[in-house]
Amino acid sequence: MAWPEKIRRLSVHGTLPYHRQQQRSGSQLRSLLMFGVGENLSLGKLFPGGCKLLGVLDYQDAPLNKFPVAVVDLYHLRYLSLRNTKVTMVPGYIIGKLHNLETLDLKKTCVRELPVEILKLQKLRHLLVYQFKVKGYAQFYSKHGFKAPNEIGNLKSLQKLCFVEANQDCGMITRQLGELSQLRRLGILKLREEDGKAFCLSIERLTNLHALSVASEGENKVIDLAFLCSPPPFLQRLYLSGRLQELPSWIQSLHSLSRLFLKWSCLKYDPLVYLQDLPSLAHLELLQVYDGDTLHFVCGKFKKLKVLGLDKFDGLKEVIVGEDTMPCLERLSIGRCELLKKVPSGIEHLNKLKVLEFFDMPDELMKTICPHGPGKDYCKISHIPNVYSTYWRDDGWDVYALDSFSRDCSPR
């Protein structure tokens, strides 16, 4: 297969049918994207003469088991993605020579540690090393990050850093984070309670931060964020996973916050009063956040909220929706609240609601809204175009539209 001598951008899908190596030149190639390539279609075989001007190399979804050695000669390489491959380690003698690298994408790989040579990449802006292992509902240990070199703060150009495991070397990593003043997105796993103060002091220095994700060492371990006095002023997305002794008071000052996920917080009081006046909040997810029996969405609050998820409130018996609250809400999901036997009181006020979804909710609740049975509350949700009941069964999701329920209010 021949192509122009001065080709600069190339996308390869699958395999090349006719391997005539002398017809392929990569001398002018700047960008190479490989999708679903065969195991034998390596960079060296594709371009025997090399492609030393290559700046972008994307191996996403390729059947790679090892870090591609051929990249050691790609001095001009700025972008390298090995996303969703089986690569397990990054050789220091290779990565340390890619001095112009700006993006290293190792998402969905098996890499769990980076060599100290990564610190030589002073132009590195995006460092993404993590993997999700989700089966069914959200699980605390479903996300795996990486161990970073202690001097990670030397990478002054970093803008995205996800997900670093912080429970190493007596909290050295948490102190180093404050040196990364250009960070816009930061993901931290396994933050120890005793490192909370050092972590907060570092976060206060990250004034350009737009997204912050923090997880404790375990779902019963505390995230201590009480020492954070001046949060990043432009923070838009905040994800906290782990016990909170109390909801950080500084959250109320985040006027740019549009997305907030709180998981396994186990608060003793209703957190909504501290969140309801956030002016930009559009997406709120709460999982095992509150031990009480009532959630009250007060009249006239949550003005911009479009998506709301409530999951695993073990003591929850009642949800109250006041008039003119959540006027923009389009999607509401409620899951695994075993004591909640009726739909939210006042749900009929949510005029813009397009999707209402229940996950493994009690049969008693579903019977109250069944259109073919005694559903006394069906009129409250009849204005919602899409109503679903979803169940986790046999390692998969079963989704039923409400109008498919039989007269005994069970999925057909």
Where are these regions (language model features)?
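Leucine-rich repeat
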Residues: 131-147, 167-170, 192-196, 218-221, ...
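C-terminal capping region of solenoid repeat domains
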Residues: 351-412
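Canonical leucine-rich repeat
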Residues: 42-43, 67, 90, 114, ...
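Surface-exposed helical/coil interface segments that assemble multiprotein signaling complexes
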Residues: 1-73, 79, 93-96, 103, ...
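Beta-propeller domains
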Residues: 232-272, 276
